Amino acid sequence: MKFIYFFICSSVGLLYSQDIVVTESNMIKVTYEHHTHYSPLGNYDTYLYLTDGLSQYVKTQKEKIVKPAWNYEYKMNFVKNINNFNFLTGAIEENRTLKDSTLLYAKWNVSDLIWTITDEEKTINGYNVRKATTDSFELEIDDPFYYNKAIAWFTTDIPIPVGPARYYGLPGLIVELEYERGSLRYVLKDIDFQAHYKFIEINKENEVDKYDVIYYDHKNPKLIKNIQKQNKKNKNKK
């Protein structure tokens, strides 16, 4: 606990720009198991790395076919997202890599998230947690599969304002994230306080709206197709 407190306080004097490159060093690594909609066979791990006021969330998944026991199969889409959160300035940046290797960049601020912290408490995996809710943003609000509210269970035992899936800004680490609709959720699996990791540098080319990296089918699909075409031309020139 003292280590975590020092980790945060030592960052106060390090207000820096978003153009940060973090080299390999000791840091905190938080592993979340991502529970998918249809079957535990589709579950996979996502990772959150933290050092001196900055976190990097890494979510990657190869395209694959999952066949649950009842002989139904579904395709898991390709996913590769790198998301940085500067929890001293509130700045968020993300790179999304598409299946054809096109790289997209978006930036926004944690102030876009409006949390309601409730009095509801419970214990998850030994952590005392409190419930908070906010509007989910993975799908458009008029989408028939919209998740409604995102529900975060966070612990002030680890007073770091981060969590999985771009949900930041609470006064403690998110231990579990779920939604009002659907079975999608993220569950804390492990915390390594002496991890070694080199932050992946964010590429700021091809800047788009944040929902072009968040929505799987993008907010501006025509723009994305044009970027992909240009990316292909650039590859062919090499």
Predicted regions, residues:
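Extended soluble regions of mature proteins
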Residues: 19-238
